[in-house]
Each structure stands twice: as C-alpha cells, then as structure tokens.
C-alpha cells in the first residue's frame, strides 16, 4: 500500500520532502504552549509515514495531498513557492468573469438593493440569488477543508498561499511558516441590517476554524496582498469590502494556539464566536494568542464572544488617522467573553486607554495587566469600568516576557520566513 501511495504521489507531482525541511514538519506544539496544548495536545501530522509526506507547489497538488475531509491519516505537506488558489484544473488563472453567474450584474445589483428604495430588508430576488451562485462558484476553487492529523508548513522563506481560504472543522492541525495573501471575495453581499448604515460583507477568511479543535497556527503572515480594501470604491456610502477575517474561530472551535504570526494592513483580523445567540460556544473557544504582531489592523485583534482567551506578549502598531487602515480597537469585549491579557504593547499615537478596546453588548469583564500604551502602563479594563474578574487564570503558557521587551522580540521573530 505504501508503494502504491508513493507512486501515486509522484505521478501527481507530489514529491517526498527533503531531510532539512522535514525537521520543521515533524515539530509539535510544546506541552504547555497555550490552549492548543490542552489534554492530547497538538501534534498535527508528525506521525506521518514517509509515503504521506509531500512537497506541493500548486493548487492541484495541495488538494490531492490533503485528500478528502475524512482523510485522517497523518500527513505532512510542505508548500514550496506560491500557490494561487484562483485557478482551474489546468492551473489557468480565474477571475470575476470566470466565476460570475450569467444573470449577475453589479450595476443591476446596486440598483435593486439601493437602501433609498429597498430599505432595510435583507436582499432577496434575482440579483441576490445570482450573486450567491457566483460566490458558490468561487468557493469551490478557493476554500479547502483541512482534515485531521495534518501539518502544513512553508518550505524555506517564501511560501505563500494567495486567494485561498483554509477551513478547519477537524482535530489536530498545524499550520506554520506560510504567508497568506488576499482571500478575495469577488461577490460581496450587501447587508442593510449590519450596523446603522449597513455594510458590505465578504465570505472568505485566510483561515477559518469552524468547530476545529487542537489547532496551532504559528509564524504565519496574513495580509490583503496586491488588492487592499483601501483601494475599493464605496457603494451606498460604505466600503465595497472584498476581504473578511484573517484567522477566525467559531461553532465550538476549541483548544487553539496562535503564536508569532504577523497580521498587517487589514480591517477585521480575528473574531472568536460568530453570534451572541450561539450560547453553545460558552465553555469553548479556548484560545491563546501570544507574540503576534498587528500592524495597521483596524479591529478584532481579537474580538471575543464567550471564550476564555489568553492574550499575552502581543505588539500592536497603527494610527487612528490612517487613510487606509485607521486603528479602531485591539480587543473586542463581546458577550460573556473572558479575555485574560498580560504584558501587551500598543503603539498608536494619541490613543487613550479607554479606546484600546471596544465593549460590545454583553461584555462585562477583562483582566488586563502590564499593558503599555505608547510607553505608559495602562489598565484598559479599569479605563472602561469593566470587572477584572473573568473567572479563570491561565496555566498553559511559557515564560511571559516583560512588557519592555515585547516590541523588539515580536518584531524580530513574528511572521513567515523566520523559522528557517
């Protein structure tokens, strides 16, 4: 059987990885490195046999190496170079006109759902249905399910996934040393009920943890690539936003560590918990964020509902007056959230302590210790009149750096291309 699998892999262009790269692929999450280390820990595909270790350099090879979502065989996948997910089976680039349903027309869509005539109802009818079909066409190419017991790592210093959305519904997944760019939705949906003025919403995150457990995302970089939303037009007075989140978690996702990642030039970075009404998330969404860098991120770094989230030694930098990505807040205190924040650093000129966070309906508590704002120690919880009692104290973590050392440590170490 192993010989057959290896022969199949070679036929598809999947090559066994070299010894040097394999060192990274066989690494597992440390025994106390955040919530991802809880119970069984996160080992990914570290137990893969040699016939289930692949190097891939295009979408076809990646999809083949992953196999079906039910493929729980341990596997290690090394990404070499850039993988563009917006391609057909012949690796021909695909764009708006390739995915677009014949009935979909943006001008007709804008006319049909103009708030001055359509009002605050959710869009329905011919153009919304055509938009949804168009989006479904794109989804079939760019969204891939990551099965259980999988490690995906970048080979060398320049591994990239462009235009893709990795979705994790499974258990025991490791993703490291990859730059994720431009999870671009060609067909944003107008939602007149989102906020007081409505908003354009997109479908794809770089990584979506949809009920997945025991996940480690480490030393990755996330950005909008060559198509930042800052260059998009406005319709109905709102930005026509083509990107959603960078690393989102919902629907019972649990036991996750996100470490040494570099998030930059983006609006909504990470939301943990999709809805206030999803009370089944209470007791789940246990996530650790440490040594991550957030540069020119507007909001959600992270925004939390329900979860016990340990946020320590992260570095935030931005400007409230930026014309492209104006800083709004770092931590979103949502319904029944339980963020435990330690020794984080925020450099946003002119920002007040109260504005470092945003408090949403049902958010009542935040533990905050050691936060430096523009060089001065603050307490964001006290500045917003929140309780400091979140009902838990983290025990799964490594040494916590002094706040004075966070900026240099994170800048020097966070992001893809720094492990090799």
From Swiss-Prot:
Descriptive protein name: Pectate lyase
Q: Which family does it belong to?
A: Belongs to the polysaccharide lyase 1 family.
Q: What organism is listed for this UniProt entry?
A: Bacillus subtilis (strain 168)
Instruction: Locate the coiled-coil region(s) and give their ranges.
Output: none
Start-end of Basic and acidic residues biased regions: 119-132
* Induction remarks: Negatively regulated by TnrA under nitrogen-limited conditions.
**Pathway given in the UniProt record:** Glycan metabolism; pectin degradation; 2-dehydro-3-deoxy-D-gluconate from pectin: step 2/5
In terms of InterPro entries, this protein maps to: Pec_lyase, Pectin_lyas_fold, Pectin_lyase_fold/virulence, PEL
Q: What is its main location?
A: secreted
The superkingdom listed in its UniProt entry is: Bacteria
Mind listing the UniProt keywords for this protein, alphabetically?
Calcium, Lyase, Metal-binding, Secreted, Signal
């Amino acid at each position: 059987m192993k010989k057959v699998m290896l022969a199949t892999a070679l036929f598809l262009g999947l090559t066994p990885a070299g010894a040097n790269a394999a060192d990274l692929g066989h690494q597992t999450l440390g025994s106390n490195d955040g919530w991802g280390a809880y119970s069984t820990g996160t080992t990914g595909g570290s137990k893969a046999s040699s016939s289930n270790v692949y190097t891939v350099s295009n979408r076809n090879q990646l999809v083949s190496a992953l196999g079906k979502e039910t493929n729980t065989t341990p596997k290690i996948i090394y990404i070499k170079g850039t993988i563009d997910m917006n391609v057909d089976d012949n690796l021909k680039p695909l764009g708006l006109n390739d995915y677009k349903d014949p009935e979909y027309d943006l001008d007709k869509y804008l006319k049909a759902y103009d708030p001055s005539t359509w009002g605050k109802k959710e869009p329905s009818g011919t153009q919304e249905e055509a938009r949804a079909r168009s989006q479904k066409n794109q989804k079939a190419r760019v969204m891939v399910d990551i099965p259980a017991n999988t490690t995906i790592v970048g080979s060398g210093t320049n591994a990239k996934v462009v235009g893709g959305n990795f979705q994790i519904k499974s258990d025991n997944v490791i993703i490291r040393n990859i730059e994720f760019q431009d999870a671009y939705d060609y067909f944003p949906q107008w939602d007149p009920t989102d906020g007081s003025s409505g908003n354009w919403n997109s479908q794809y995150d770089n990584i979506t943890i949809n009920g997945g457990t025991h996940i480690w995302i480490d030393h990755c970089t996330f950005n909008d690539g060559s198509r930042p939303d800052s260059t998009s037009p406005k319709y109905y007075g709102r930005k026509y936003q083509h990107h959603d989140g960078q690393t989102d978690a919902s629907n019972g996702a649990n036991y996750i560590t996100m470490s040494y990642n570099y998030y930059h030039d983006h609006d909504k970075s990470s939301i943990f918990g999709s809805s206030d009404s999803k009370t089944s998330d209470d007791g789940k969404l246990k996530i650790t964020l440490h040594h991550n860098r957030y540069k020119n991120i507007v909001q959600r770094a992270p925004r939390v509902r329900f979860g016990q989230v340990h946020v320590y030694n992260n570095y935030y930098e931005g400007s409230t007056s930026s014309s492209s990505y104006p800083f709004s807040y770092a931590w979103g205190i949502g319904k029944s959230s339980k963020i435990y924040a330690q020794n984080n650093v925020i450099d946003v000129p002119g920002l007040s302590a109260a504005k470092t966070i945003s408090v949403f309906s049902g958010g009542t508590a935040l533990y905050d210790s050691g936060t430096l704002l523009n060089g001065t120690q603050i307490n964001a919880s006290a500045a917003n009149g929140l309780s400091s009692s979140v009902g838990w104290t983290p025990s799964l973590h490594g040494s916590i750096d002094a706040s004075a050392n966070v900026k240099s440590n994170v800048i020097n170490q966070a992001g893809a291309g720094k492990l090799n």
